[in-house]
């Protein structure tokens, strides 16, 4: 036996044996944690992959193929006007009702296209944090003070975090953007800006309305939109198809076949609209992979993002589910520990709320009922705001993917800035309104 050559395989084998030997199977909390991890993964796959992640992957792929890199550099690059760059990045979340994981393909798309780290991280934070529906729900259920504080804090946070990231990594980012500019010196705008704008608006419309949540009150505008969500989504899909035929040389007969398949699914299974949506995604993928060079490049880019992000997200969801469980359920960490640690308005309570929020996974809009339960269990208002500001923008799955895009150092800095600023905001809010 060659110890130098075989010590690593031997170590892995020994480690695996020890883990298997001492595996706490039969301990109720461990068994429950395994089930919670699998339940959360199932819930994530059913509620977020088809309608959230896959459309986001297609948008990210389109950004890298169809969006002019010079346009990205002009509006979001390191040398862009700060007012424009951070203004666009910080309020983008008011349009996108996405969670911390769905925003990742979009962030990866603009970052790789040459967006400066400041505007890119401002968008990364604001995407899930500045959600109009979530802010309205926060004000309605948790109180107007928390709702306003969340809205103002999220906008300010995104700008400040972006500026600090630019300040810390500005020199290295200049080298990256110069390299990007050099590789795109012959970049030409193939289509007018208004065509590109309408094209992306149609895809964003599909993403927004396919994920429109059911409101608590069965009346009013939000409920009307919810009752028509799939009709509206279908309208945006038809609009996208017409633009692809007119401007992107996609064959009309291929899109008509996909449309017939989707319509048949919707008519045959009216109570399961997700099946029709899935049929549309599959058909659309076939259209792209059998189309011209531009269409194939779009799908290749989309698939590239999926290969990078999917495994890390699923692994992160499993770990988060095992440690913390689903909302209303427990994993390895008892919920009593969490609720007892966030009472009052001490520095430690706010810090713990920020860290716990950063590692927990919140699906879109779920943070409000979770916080409602924690406030009822004695959580202070300061820690509640800290969790609201840190939670939706970060999660364990989200962190794993960000590291693969930006690197370890930038990811740790981004997470630290979010946690520290959320903690400070929580302390200040608790002192004023606690």
Stretches with model-predicted labels:
Residues 34-80, 310-317, 321-343:
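Helix-loop-helix hairpins and the membrane-proximal interhelical loops
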Residues 10-11, 50-54, 83-87, 121, ...:
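Hydrophobic alpha-helical transmembrane segments
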Residues 1-8, 139, 143-195, 241, ...:
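Juxtamembrane and boundary regions of transmembrane helices in multi-pass small-molecule transporters
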Residues 41, 45-52, 58, 80-95, ...:
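Small-residue-enriched transmembrane helix starts and helix-helix packing motifs
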Residues 60, 64, 96, 157-162, ...:
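Alpha-helical transmembrane segments of multipass membrane proteins
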Residues 69, 80-82, 93-151, 321-406, ...:
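Membrane-interfacial helix-loop connectors
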Residues 16-29, 206-211:
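Alpha-helical transmembrane segments of multi-pass membrane proteins
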Residues 76, 205, 210-364:
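Transmembrane helical segments that form the transport core of multi-pass membrane transport proteins
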